[in-house]
Amino acid sequence: MNTLDTNNIKWSENVIIADADYIDRVAFDLIVNFERMINRRIQPADMAQWAVCIALDGGLREGEHETQVVLIHDKQSMAMKNFRPANYEKDLNAQAFKDDKLGEFIISSYPTEEKMVGKDDFLLDVARTVCNTKEVKRVMVIPNSEDGDAYDRLREILRKVDDDDKRITLFAMQPMPGGNFRQEILGYSLMNALGISANEIK
């Protein structure tokens, strides 16, 4: 299904690229662990709130910006289980929302299937294209850093990016081997989107 020609897309100055199945799984793990810890029910993560937090962690500051959110998922997965809104085709793809402080966020979702182009390969291809696009100033990537070699391959791609004007941030659940990019912890944005406050987990 990967008929996307990433070279012909008009990219925004800010681009978030995420393995959506992975962030959905991490959100589930956080819900299970924190419900036990704080002894209350936790609602699914707010997709808009999560995207705003990722953009802030990626260096975006207040202003009338445009940010693209690229959600890459397995074709079999029709909807996210631990985020709202959830359904890729009906609720997320080609949708947009406006944040009072950071401007417009435009969401696209792309289903992938292994026999065509695998999800990791597709994510790396999008990341490579975006990082080589002059107009893009900030790139935030959330690969599956726990299974497979997507993170290491991404590090290798980013090593070759020669653009001092670009701010590239990779997100993972724990500090990972560094490279030609910044690192942030994925858990903070997810906890915020799940409505878990720092006070509750002291």
Language-model segments: residues:
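Acidic, polar low-complexity linker/tail segments
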Residues: 1-12
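Single, functionally critical "micro-switch" positions that shape active/binding sites
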Residues: 2, 18, 145
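A generic local structural motif
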Residues: 2-3, 125-128, 155
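A charged nuclease-like catalytic/ligand-binding cleft shared by nucleic-acid processing domains
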Residues: 11-15, 20-25, 32, 36-140, ...
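Cofactor-binding loop segments of dinucleotide-utilizing enzymes, especially the Rossmann-like FAD-
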Residues: 74, 144, 173-175
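Short, surface-exposed basic-aromatic patches at helix termini and helix-loop junctions that form
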Residues: 129-134, 155-167
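Acidic, metal-binding active-site segment of PIN/NYN-like and related structure-specific nucleases
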Residues: 139-150, 154-158
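Short, flexible loop segments at boundaries between secondary-structure elements
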Residues: 161-195
